[in-house]
């Protein structure tokens, strides 16, 4: 999956918006693209690297996903009880990544 496909997928959800919320923290050294629904973030990734995404996840599913896939790692600067990072082009199929991104959107949309 490439960055354009992933961005288009995240923006395909009703009410989804994209923003670059972390500019002031990294002073232009890193650029993150984040996706929101109802003003709340459900996914983000570093634009320059595009090596992983961070998404909200059902707490009951995190341990199972971590055991099943090496590509599931603790998130950077998010609560690991509710968020995971998924490395792209690793052992998790794109179809499963998309399912989890969709699930993240649904979790956040209901908040």
Regions found by a protein language model. Give the residues of each.
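Charge-dense, helix-prone N-terminal extensions
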Residues: 1-111
